[in-house]
Regions:
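AlphaC helix of the eukaryotic protein kinase fold
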Residues: 5-27
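AlphaC helix of the protein kinase catalytic domain
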Residues: 58-70
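C-terminal lobe helix-coil module of Hanks-type protein kinase domains
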Residues: 86, 105, 137-235
Length: 236
């Protein structure tokens, strides 16, 4: 297991957020989601007991591989796994809202697991959750701007991660949220097919749709997005 703890003097909001994360994650039992086993408060201390993943996160992996990007087969496997995790979460009314390379774990057997549901919100009866801060460069416009979000926010973030995994570059990275928003609305300076002419056209089209600034233009579900990506990249 992995133990994450907070001692005396830790801001109450930090502990509250951690416990909210644990309660949310405990609802999600899935082979592609990092398991939270327990969460407790004892006096001035709070701790989470989580599954230990023996491996690397995607950011660490990209830093080690030649060229800083994944093969098509590796990317297909990653997206297939993450889509299953997210679809399960979405079906249970949970949004992730902070999908990024450091929250994607790959163990020594090649199993991909999504970690840190700290930004996750339980959706309302209408299926929507209030936007909360994720990570600049991976958040869609509606989340950056504090508007209502739904599953399509996670689709956008997943697409940003995939594009980065295929090219080694996050085209929406910015020093500020405003700078990142500008990149999103203007679109990537270098089209994907110019960065890698061998990328299947269907993958480029699916990414373009998923990265639309307008949520209604994106795919309707994370599984729909994965289906458009995995087969053209060569299945798993």
């Amino acid at each position: 297991v992995s133990l994450q703890g907070w001692g005396a003097g830790v801001l109450a909001s930090t502990v509250d957020e951690a416990l909210s994360e644990a309660r949310t994650a405990c609802l999600l039992a899935h082979p592609n989601i990092v398991t939270v086993h327990d969460f407790e408060i004892e006096g001035d201390y709070a701790y989470l007991v989580m599954e230990f993943v023996d491996g690397l996160n995607l950011s660490e992996l990209l830093a080690r591989v030649e060229g800083g990007y994944l093969t098509y087969a590796e990317a297909a496997h990653m997206i297939s796994s993450l889509a299953k995790a997210l679809q399960y979460a979405h079906e249970n009314g949970v949004l992730h809202l902070d999908i990024k390379p450091t929250n994607i774990m790959i163990d020594r057997q090649g199993t991909v697991k999504l970690a840190d549901f700290g930004m996750a919100t339980l959706a309302s009866a209408a299926g929507y959750g209030g936007a909360r801060g994720g990570t600049v460069g991976y958040m869609p416009p509606e989340q950056v701007e504090g508007m209502l979000v739904d599953e399509r926010a996670d689709i956008f973030s997943l697409a940003v991660v995939l594009r980065q995994a295929l090219t080694g570059v996050n085209v929406f990275a910015g020093r500020t949220a405003k700078e990142s928003l500008d990149h999103i609305y203007k679109g990537p300076k270098i089209p994907l097919l110019k960065q890698d002419p061998e990328v299947p056209f269907a993958v480029d089209a699916a990414l373009t749709q998923a990265l639309s600034p307008e949520p209604s233009m994106r795919q309707g579900s994370v599984l729909e997005f994965a289906q458009e990506i995995v087969a053209p990249l060569g299945n798993e």
